């Protein structure tokens, strides 16, 4: 047996060993068992690094033995997938960076394009590579790369349909449609500012000393979050919906400016004239990953993203994470779902019959009356208890009706033994006012959205308005009043951001110096992510209170439990003046009562 044969056999054995380990890690649940997941990841990562190093050291002999470029691309793709899966388990920024580096190298070196193969299996590998790189670029917020990938992916799918006419590529056409729809929904105002926590926008020098000095009797650390959205036909890509994507981004640190990649996303044309394809190069610039990682930032909170979970699965994940939650820590739970089986938003209620306005008001009034008066109340030890927490619900299921798909407020009670920050985004969110466990921080969305142009109210096209306010308040404000990014330049929006930033700084001082701030809010105020959510809630509530008809205010306004101080209520002159400044700056004060 020649030395080349020995090298080839060793390489194949390393590939098989790494793939077996990869299969075991891929099938592990994404949530819980941190120590086991870390150990398994370390083993499979070590196997692939050994394989990667071996092919680099023996590349010439492997090429002589018939190694194809796409085989190296497949190994690199597996490593990228391994990093991405670990990012989804841990939310550690370095893993998404490493995934991006490997996928970008595969694309720039054209591992799958070096030889014009007619092998259907290789084409499927290339399709999967593009779909995964699209998801990584989306989460990593690389818009230029996304645009490039969509063009190439669309071309590849069309090419596959032409060359493999006997094969059905409908599934891949749907992937193209998903990402195009997602990017269309998320493209407005994308250049204003990042959704992630950015020191440039979210750290306010004026109020920073007050935040630094603030210390509650008990301070909780924000460590874990569960994010899930379940609506019919909602905007999504892969298993990331538009709403969960916005929440994911909102709970991440943005690298400082020096850590942005300065290299433009430009690749040569398909001729590949300037790229050396003479050998199966396996060299990937690992230093680029270090350039994209900001060592000054604290770790991101770990986020568990659940796509269309069953109620039992959701409860099981909550229980698992509660069990592993460190002492003196708080968990955020974000639930976005309809309160009625098979109805995902107000727009669908409108189309069920009758005029839009009367249908909306009648249906939502019935919901409100049911919440406020129809359910019986019980007196236990002199305390009034409502049965609402087993009457109203969120709907986590496909078409049809049935109790197993209902998530009741009472289902959350056992987990309130640990500190919780609950965000309920639903047309039946106010049902969670009946939650009667240990006191949790609660944000409850309005029962219906409010827009100048009601066509924007369709959450299947634009996502939730309440979630948009919590993750991108200026963009949500502009969308509400019909103000598009084409209406003005970047400096104009920068000035609008400064108005909001100044307002948030003032409200931070109020919260940090208030003597009436409930302990539930005080113990999370030191956390930058949760503090930013509180400030944005205050802004959202005041904007909607001034924009919406007063006779239907209960349906249009979000609710927080416990109450925040009166000094930051929608009726506060200081808070209203901030909305007034922003509305005047954008020239939309006429849409707000008491502002003109």
Give the positions of each predicted feature.
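N-terminal alpha-helical scaffolding segments that mark the starts
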Residues: 1-50, 56-57
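TPR repeat positional signature
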Residues: 14, 21, 76, 83, ...
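Short coil/turn linking the two alpha-helices of tandem helical-hairpin repeats
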Residues: 25-30, 80, 85-91, 134, ...
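Flexible helix-coil transition and linker loops at the boundaries of alpha-helical arrays
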Residues: 51-70, 108-121
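Cytosolic small-GTPase signaling regions in large eukaryotic proteins
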Residues: 98-226, 230, 502-541
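Functional beta-strand-loop-alpha-helix junction segments that form "active/interaction loops"
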Residues: 244, 251-331, 349-352, 374-375, ...
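Cysteine protease catalytic core and zymogen-processing segment of caspase-like enzymes
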Residues: 341-474
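Active-site-proximal C-terminal subdomain of hydrolase catalytic domains
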Residues: 420-545
């Amino acid at each position: 047996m020649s030395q080349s044969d020995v090298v080839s056999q060793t390489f194949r054995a390393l590939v098989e060993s790494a793939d077996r380990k990869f299969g075991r890690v891929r099938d592990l649940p994404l949530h819980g068992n941190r120590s086991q997941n870390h150990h398994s990841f370390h083993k499979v990562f070590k196997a692939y690094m050994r394989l990667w190093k071996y092919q680099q050291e023996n590349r010439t002999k492997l090429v002589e033995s018939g190694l194809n470029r796409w085989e190296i691309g497949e190994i690199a793709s597996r490593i990228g997938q391994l990093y991405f899966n670990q990012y989804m388990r841990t939310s550690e920024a370095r893993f998404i960076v490493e995934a991006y580096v490997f996928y970008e190298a595969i694309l720039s070196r054209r591992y799958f394009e070096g030889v014009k193969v007619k092998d259907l299996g290789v084409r499927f590998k290339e399709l999967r590579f593009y779909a995964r790189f699209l998801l990584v670029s989306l989460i990593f917020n690389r818009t230029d790369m996304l645009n490039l990938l969509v063009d190439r992916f669309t071309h590849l799918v069309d090419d596959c349909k032409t060359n493999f006419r006997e094969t059905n590529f409908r599934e891949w056409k749907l992937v193209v449609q998903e990402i195009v729809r997602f990017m269309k929904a998320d493209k407005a105002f994308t250049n204003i500012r990042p959704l992630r926590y950015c020191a440039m926008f979210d750290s306010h020098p004026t109020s920073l000393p007050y935040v630094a000095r603030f210390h509650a009797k008990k301070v909780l650390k924000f460590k874990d979050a569960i994010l899930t959205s379940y609506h019919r036909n909602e905007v999504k890509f892969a298993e990331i919906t538009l709403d969960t994507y916005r929440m994911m981004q909102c709970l991440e640190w943005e690298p400082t400016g020096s850590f942005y990649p300065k290299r433009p996303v430009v690749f040569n044309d398909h001729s590949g004239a300037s790229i050396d394809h003479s050998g199966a190069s396996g060299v990937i610039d690992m230093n680029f990953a270090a350039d994209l990682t900001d060592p000054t930032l604290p770790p991101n909170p770990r986020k568990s993203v659940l796509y269309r979970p069953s109620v039992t699965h959701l409860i099981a994940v909550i229980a698992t994470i509660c069990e592993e939650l460190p002492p003196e820590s708080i968990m955020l739970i974000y639930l976005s779902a309809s309160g009625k089986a098979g109805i995902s938003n107000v727009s669908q209620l409108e189309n069920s019959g009758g005029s839009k306005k009367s249908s909306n008001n009648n249906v939502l009034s019935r919901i409100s009356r049911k919440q406020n008066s129809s359910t019986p109340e019980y007196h236990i030890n002199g305390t009034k208890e409502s049965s609402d927490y087993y009457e109203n619900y969120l709907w986590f299921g496909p078409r049809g009706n049935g109790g197993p798909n209902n998530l009741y407020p009472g289902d959350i009670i056992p987990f309130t033994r640990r500190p919780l920050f609950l965000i309920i985004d639903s047309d039946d969110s106010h049902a969670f006012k009946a939650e009667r466990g240990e006191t949790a921080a609660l944000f409850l969305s309005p029962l219906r959205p409010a827009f100048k142009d009601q066509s924007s109210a369709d959450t299947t096209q634009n996502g939730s308005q309440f979630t948009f306010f919590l993750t991108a308040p200026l963009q949500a404000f502009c969308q509400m009043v019909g103000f598009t990014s084409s209406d003005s330049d970047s400096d104009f929006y920068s000035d609008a951001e400064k108005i909001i930033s100044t307002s948030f700084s003032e409200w931070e001082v109020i919260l940090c110096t208030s003597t009436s701030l409930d302990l539930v809010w005080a113990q999370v105020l030191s956390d930058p992510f949760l503090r930013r959510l509180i400030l944005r809630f205050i802004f959202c509530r005041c904007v909607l209170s001034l924009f919406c008809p007063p006779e239907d205010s209960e349906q249009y306004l979000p609710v927080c439990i416990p109450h925040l101080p009166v000094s930051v209520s929608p009726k506060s002159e200081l808070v209203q003046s901030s909305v007034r400044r922003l509305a005047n700056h954008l020239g939309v004060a006429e849409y707000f009562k008491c502002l003109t």
